[in-house]
Design a protein with these regions (language model features):
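Active-site-proximal beta-strand elements of phosphoester/diester hydrolases
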Residues: 2-11, 113-125, 149, 184-188, ...
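Divalent metal-coordination and catalytic microenvironments
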Residues: 9, 32, 37, 81, ...
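Core catalytic region of metal-dependent phosphoesterases/phosphodiesterases
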Residues: 14-111, 259
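A short acidic, glycine-rich active-site loop
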Residues: 51-60, 206-218
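Binuclear metal-dependent phosphoesterase catalytic core
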Residues: 108-112, 208-211, 218-226, 239-284
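Active-site-proximal loop/helix segment associated with metal-binding centers of metalloenzymes
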Residues: 114-211
């Protein structure tokens, strides 16, 4: 058995993190996956002082968990999401240096006999922060969304990357010719036209053009269809599970799971990599 916990879109909400840490302490999973949008929106003051959520709040609590669990401390795989400023990678790197987690974006990592891949970027959104946004399969931008070449970034990137980079190209480079039959992909974006990317855009128009209610990545969808990894993990679209009545889907043989949730609770997904189709989700 390779027991895993998965959460996403916690947005720095301390109560959700406390519930997650309590579950990890009680259940002693082999791995914990953090699927992006980890940081507080607007960075409110932290209890007890400090302004860096990762270093001043999360880091000490992960250290406490490691001290409590000892050798049973889980492998923690983390990516950022589109609401997380890339400038905070410095703090995430510091937590990795301390051995508390691994920043998985753009990397292939190992968990026993399983390969773990992380990818944080999402297709263009209506929001201004573009650190983790890419064109999807082309330079097309849905009505109402803002191009990755516009908006703002907390960390500068080369103009060519902004203009020509795509999720499709990134995934080809990330996976190469690897055998993905025992691979887990930790994404922030869900795949397009699934139960996991259904947004509350019904009857909405921009300049009389109806908006697509599916806002996931076409590139991720095609990648999963073609390469068939064992499991894909997703977040980003908080309301999807409520609107589609499901937090999981399948693309061929690939099990696709989402931990996004639009209520106040923590959505905690539990799964075993030896039987991911038996995954469960609990609202805590």
């Amino acid at each position: 058995m390779t027991r895993c916990l998965f959460v996403s879109d916690l947005h720095g909400q301390l109560e959700r993190y406390e519930k997650l840490l309590a579950a990890a302490a009680a259940e002693r999973p082999d791995a914990l996956f953090l699927g992006g949008d980890l940081l507080p929106l607007g960075a409110p003051p932290l209890p007890g002082g400090g302004s860096d959520f990762l270093l001043d709040w999360l880091g000490p609590r992960l250290e406490d968990l490691r001290e409590r669990l000892g050798p049973a401390y889980p492998r923690v795989f983390a990516i950022f999401g589109n609401d997380d400023p890339r400038a905070e990678e410095v703090s995430l790197a510091e937590l990795e240096t301390r051995g508390l987690l691994v920043h998985a974006h753009g990397r292939r990592l190992q968990l026993g006999s399983f390969s773990i891949y992380g990818y944080a970027c999402v297709p263009p959104t209506p929001f201004a922060l573009k650190d983790w946004e890419r064109y999807d399969v082309s330079r097309f931008v849905d009505p109402g969304c803002v191009s990755p070449e516009e908006g703002y970034r907390s960390v500068p990137v080369p103009d060519g990357e902004t203009k020509w980079g795509t999720i499709a190209g990134d995934l080809v480079a990330l996976a190469g010719a690897d055998d993905l039959s025992r691979a887990v992909f930790l994404f922030h974006s869900p795949p397009y036209r699934t139960r996991l990317d259904r947004a509350a855009l019904d009857d909405r128009e921009v300049d009389k053009v109806p908006l697509d209610v599916h806002v996931g990545s076409i590139a991720i969808r095609r990648f999963v269809e073609e390469r068939q990894p064992l499991v894909t993990l997703h977040g980003h679209v908080h309301e999807a599970a409520r609107l589609s009545s499901s937090w999981q889907d399948r693309i061929g043989a690939t099990v696709c799971l989402s931990a996004a949730h639009d209520g106040p609770e923590l959505a905690l997904v539990r799964f075993d990599l030896e039987a991911p189709e038996a995954a469960t989700r609990e609202l805590l």
